């Protein structure tokens, strides 16, 4: 399978080298890296080219790298039933740099891009309906960013007396606890009953 993927990577470099920044086969999967401005042309080529035939759109997801200037990777997964192959297309983008929407090439990208927007704040130009899809309308922040607090910003609960949803500041029921310590089974000097044989001498 990796031989066929290497051949496909070589074919993509030859046929559309100007659209591709990198193409590598790693862990039995082909990953193609492109710039945002070349994304739509590359996805169209992968879908329409006879040698490729990546007509099945699987997923779009985001990956957060807060230490990089282009903080996010937008990752597209495609499947070619004819070739029985998968390809991953990666595009790097910054917090305020939009990526062209893939909905013109693959209409099924619609809700996946909305999810990436909702969870990471990744913007997509040309998207027909870019709004939150998983979180509440008034939700603040983007929960899958690595700098999003674990407790969130507000606590949402249903107030049975008021018969409505109530937003309140987060109130921790206990003080923050640091669990960075040795367990009772690590670093002990004594021998527990039954461990005499397992203990090195």
Curated annotation (Swiss-Prot):
Reaction(s) this enzyme catalyzes, per UniProt: a quinone + NADH + 5 H(+)(in) = a quinol + NAD(+) + 4 H(+)(out)
EC number: 7.1.1.-
PROSITE patterns, per database record: COMPLEX1_30K (PS00542)
Subcellular location: Cell inner membrane
A cellular-component GO term for this protein: plasma membrane
GO terms for MF: NADH dehydrogenase (ubiquinone) activity; NADH:ubiquinone reductase (non-electrogenic) activity; quinone binding
Topology in the lipid bilayer: Peripheral membrane protein
Gene3D superfamilies cross-referenced by the UniProt entry: NADH:ubiquinone oxidoreductase, 30kDa subunit
InterPro entries: NADH_DH_suC (IPR010218), NADH_quin_OxRdtase_su_C/D-like (IPR037232), NADH_UbQ_OxRdtase_30kDa_su (IPR001268), NADH_UbQ_OxRdtase_CS (IPR020396)
Keywords: Cell inner membrane, Cell membrane, Membrane, NAD, Quinone, Translocase, Transport, Ubiquinone
PANTHER family: NADH DEHYDROGENASE [UBIQUINONE] IRON-SULFUR PROTEIN 3, MITOCHONDRIAL (PTHR10884:SF14), NADH DEHYDROGENASE UBIQUINONE IRON-SULFUR PROTEIN 3 (PTHR10884)
Biological function: NDH-1 shuttles electrons from NADH, via FMN and iron-sulfur (Fe-S) centers, to quinones in the respiratory chain. The immediate electron acceptor for the enzyme in this species is believed to be ubiquinone. Couples the redox reaction to proton translocation (for every two electrons transferred, four hydrogen ions are translocated across the cytoplasmic membrane), and thus conserves the redox energy in a proton gradient.
Subunit organization: NDH-1 is composed of 14 different subunits. Subunits NuoB, C, D, E, F, and G constitute the peripheral sector of the complex.
UniProt record similarity statement: Belongs to the complex I 30 kDa subunit family.
Protein name listed in UniProt: NADH-quinone oxidoreductase subunit C 1
């Amino acid at each position: 399978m990796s031989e066929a993927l290497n051949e496909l990577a070589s074919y993509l470099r030859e046929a559309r080298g100007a659209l591709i920044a990198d193409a590598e086969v790693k862990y039995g999967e082909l990953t193609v890296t492109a710039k945002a401005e070349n994304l739509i042309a590359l996805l169209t080529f992968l879908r329409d080219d006879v040698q490729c035939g990546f007509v099945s759109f699987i997923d779009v997801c985001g990956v957060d790298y807060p230490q990089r200037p282009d903080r996010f990777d937008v990752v597209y997964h495609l499947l070619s039933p004819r070739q029985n192959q998968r390809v991953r297309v990666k595009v790097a983008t910054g917090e305020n740099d939009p990526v062209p929407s893939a909905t013109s090439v693959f209409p099924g990208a619609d809700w996946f891009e909305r999810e990436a927007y909702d969870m990471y704040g990744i913007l997509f130009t040309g998207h027909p309906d870019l709004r939150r899809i998983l979180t509440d309308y008034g939700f603040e922040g983007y929960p899958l960013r690595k700098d999003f607090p674990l407790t969130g910003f507000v606590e949402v609960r249903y107030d049975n007396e008021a018969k409505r949803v109530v937003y309140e500041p987060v109130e921790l029921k206990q003080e923050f606890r640091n669990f960075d310590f040795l367990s009772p089974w690590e670093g002990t000097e004594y021998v527990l009953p039954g461990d005499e044989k397992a203990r090195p001498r």
